[in-house]
């Protein structure tokens, strides 16, 4: 046992000595195997085999590839930002003018100093790119400013001028509406002054409501000059409206010459004043002596042929045309004893009796002369 062990030990020592001495000697097959191993390590097939052997887990490589990808992305983003900055900015800005200033510009530049709504919008669109892009969103604003501001006047289109829409122009009194001719600053809101003639006509129209209303034959239409109508004093018998408080019945009439001469005068001649005073005293005594029972109003009481009369009849001048047309008869007219029979026909308001009619009732039993 000792010999074999010693012999084996000597053999092993000899092999080790030889291998150490002949380290540079190429052993048969060792070099080729080493080359094959190196090639297998470098080949991708061997790499995949190693991945399979490790259970599908790939050995992580160096982060050199990911860093290059991040650098590429950063460069592309920088290029995009530079491209955006190099693009020209939008130069369309809203003009600093109000709609009133824009309308005034367009009207002043026109040869006739008047434009339609479409012409105003066309001028604004051609002059300002901002409104050209926003059209027609602002067209209603132009229309409202034209209608609501007194500085713009609407002119109807002429019959021989075909087209659509009315013309608009500037009020001559609104020339100094902008400060120093600058359209950027407006002094104050322009308000058109009401004309004096218009105010006078409005006052006359309001006063004419009532007795002399617009519906009456003597009513004056609004807008016409008062001189176009004949004054009531020029008529033979002024018009008496059927309104107002009533006077005592059976008012005697004055001569037509006196009515014409003293149509609206508050004073009468001395002779007429004496006549009126005597008639008033006579009428007062007659009214006191009248019986309390009065007959009803009827045509027989007005147009009667009875000659019986308690008081001597008193004649007067011919009645107005209105009474003559109502009583078309050639027979003599005899008034009734009742004062209420003739009252509604000859009653007039108190505001028209000055200088025209007597203030008291004096013809309770008067008779008109035959025609």
Curated annotation (Swiss-Prot):
Protein's UniProt keywords contain RNA-binding = no
DNA-binding residues (ranges):
94-188
The record's annotation in SUPFAM superfamilies points to:
Winged helix' DNA-binding domain (SSF46785)
- Can the keyword Chaperone be found in this entry's annotation? no
Task: Provide the protein's localization.
Answer: Nucleus
Q: Recite the UniProt keywords alphabetically.
A: Developmental protein, Differentiation, DNA-binding, Neurogenesis, Nucleus, Repressor, Transcription, Transcription regulation
Instruction: Name the Gene3D superfamilies on file.
Output: Winged helix-like DNA-binding domain superfamily/Winged helix DNA-binding domain
GO CC terms on record? Answer: nucleus
Q: Which SMART domains match?
A: FH
- Looking at the record's lineage, which domain of life comes first? Eukaryota
What does this chain do? Transcriptional repressor that is an essential upstream regulator of neural crest determination and mesoderm induction. Functions by recruiting the transcriptional corepressor tle4. Also acts in a negative auto-regulator loop by inhibiting the transcription of its own gene.
Q: What is this protein called?
A: Forkhead box protein D3-B
Q: What organism is the protein native to?
A: Xenopus laevis (African clawed frog)
């Amino acid at each position: 046992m000792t010999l074999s062990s010693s012999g084996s030990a000597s053999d092993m020592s000899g092999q080790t000595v030889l291998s150490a001495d002949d380290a540079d000697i190429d052993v048969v097959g060792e070099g080729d195997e080493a080359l094959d191993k190196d090639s297998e390590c470098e080949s991708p097939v061997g790499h995949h085999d190693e991945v399979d052997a490790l259970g599908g887990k790939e050995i992580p490589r160096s982060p050199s590839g990911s860093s290059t990808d991040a650098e590429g992305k950063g460069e592309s983003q920088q290029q995009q930002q530079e491209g955006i900055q190099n693009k020209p900015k939008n130069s369309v800005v809203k003009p600093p003018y109000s709609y009133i200033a824009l309308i005034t510009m367009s009207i002043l530049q026109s040869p006739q100093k008047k434009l339609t709504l479409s012409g105003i919008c066309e001028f604004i669109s051609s002059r300002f790119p901002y409104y050209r892009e926003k059209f027609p969103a602002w067209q209603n604003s132009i229309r409202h400013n034209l209608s609501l501001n007194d500085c713009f006047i609407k002119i109807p289109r002429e019959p021989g001028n075909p087209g659509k829409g009315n013309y608009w122009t500037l009020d001559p009194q609104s020339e100094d509406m902008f400060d120093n001719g600058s359209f950027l600053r407006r002094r104050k809101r322009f308000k058109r002054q009401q004309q004096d003639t218009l105010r006078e006509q409005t006052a006359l129209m309001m006063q004419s409501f009532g007795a002399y209303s617009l519906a009456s034959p003597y009513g004056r239409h609004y807008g016409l000059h008062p001189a176009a109508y004949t004054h009531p004093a020029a008529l033979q018998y002024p018009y008496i409206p059927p309104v107002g408080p009533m006077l005592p019945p059976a008012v005697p009439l004055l001569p037509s010459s006196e009515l014409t001469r003293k149509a609206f005068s508050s004073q009468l001649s001395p002779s007429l004043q004496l006549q009126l005073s005597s008639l008033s005293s006579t009428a007062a005594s007659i009214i006191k002596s009248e019986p309390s029972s009065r007959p009803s109003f009827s045509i027989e009481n007005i147009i009667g042929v009875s000659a019986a009369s308690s008081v001597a009849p008193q004649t007067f001048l011919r009645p107005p045309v209105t009474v003559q047309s109502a009583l078309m008869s050639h027979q003599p007219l005899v008034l009734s004893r009742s004062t209420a029979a003739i009252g509604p026909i000859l009653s007039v308001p108190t505001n028209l009796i000055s200088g025209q009619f007597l203030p008291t009732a004096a013809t309770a039993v008067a008779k008109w002369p035959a025609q």
